[in-house]
């Protein structure tokens, strides 16, 4: 049955208009969530579809949702596909920050968490876009908070030892922003980093204390 459904969905999606394409992509993502690892034989075909449709801006959100579903279904088996899809996901963070792009970026952050430890070797590429997102003043509170909590979530999946400084200093700068929701997200994330880094976190404590006393007293 699956052998018939996946090719059929791919064919119909290619030949439909953009509105129907979005619906079909959502259905494929749901199907992947049902059949889970049994989708493995169709992954190359699905990625062909993703690559073919990626440049259609209105489809990027459902395409990221589809990629996230694949990452969740395949778990460790998803690792070989990351080099081909990650550049596309990172490119979502370029250009003007529209409402649609913001929603897609948030979905990419959720996908990063789904990829889990598979993404660890690409942290040097992933961390800059996360940091940029939680620091950017034109970003929505939801986008910035999601970026911050993505660091918290990833801290349970990957080793941040080599990236602590480039993560923590920007987080501390966010504490100066007059928004309690962001500040609480930062504090929760810093606590998660303390848990992972242990004594290596001590070097950052004076700076955190100074900023906390200045802006959160």
Question: Which residues does each PLM region occupy?
Answer:
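Alpha-helical structural elements of signaling/regulatory helical domains
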Residues: 19, 38, 55, 59, ...
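Core helices of alpha-solenoid repeat scaffolds
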Residues: 1-7, 28, 39-48, 63, ...
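Hydrophobic residues within the alpha-helices of tandem HEAT/HEAT-like
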Residues: 9-13, 24-35, 53-54, 63-75, ...
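HEAT/HEAT-like alpha-solenoid repeats
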Residues: 3-14, 18, 33, 44-55, ...
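Residue-level detector of extended alpha-helical repeat arrays and alpha-solenoid scaffolds
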Residues: 21, 60, 101-105, 140, ...
């Amino acid at each position: 049955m699956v052998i018939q459904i996946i090719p059929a969905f791919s064919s119909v999606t290619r030949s439909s208009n953009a509105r129907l394409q979005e619906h079909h992509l959502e259905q494929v993502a749901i199907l992947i969530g049902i059949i889970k690892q049994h989708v493995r034989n169709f992954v190359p075909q699905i990625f062909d579809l993703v690559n073919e449709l990626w440049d259609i801006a209105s489809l990027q959100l459902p395409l990221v949702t589809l990629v996230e579903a694949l990452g969740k279904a395949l778990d460790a088996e998803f690792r070989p596909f990351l080099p081909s899809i990650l550049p596309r996901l990172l490119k979502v963070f370029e250009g003007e920050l529209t409402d649609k792009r913001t929603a897609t970026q948030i979905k990419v952050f959720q996908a990063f968490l789904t990829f889990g430890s598979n993404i660890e070797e690409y942290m040097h590429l992933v961390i800059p876009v996360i940091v940029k997102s939680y620091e950017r003043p034109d970003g929505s509170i939801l986008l910035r908070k999601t970026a911050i909590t993505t660091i918290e979530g990833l801290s349970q999946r990957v080793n941040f030892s080599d990236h602590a400084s480039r993560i923590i200093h920007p987080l501390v700068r966010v504490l100066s922003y007059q928004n309690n929701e962001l500040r609480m997200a930062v504090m929760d994330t810093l606590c998660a980093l303390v848990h992972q880094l242990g004594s290596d976190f001590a070097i950052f404590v004076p700076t955190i204390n100074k900023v906390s006393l200045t802006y959160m007293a």
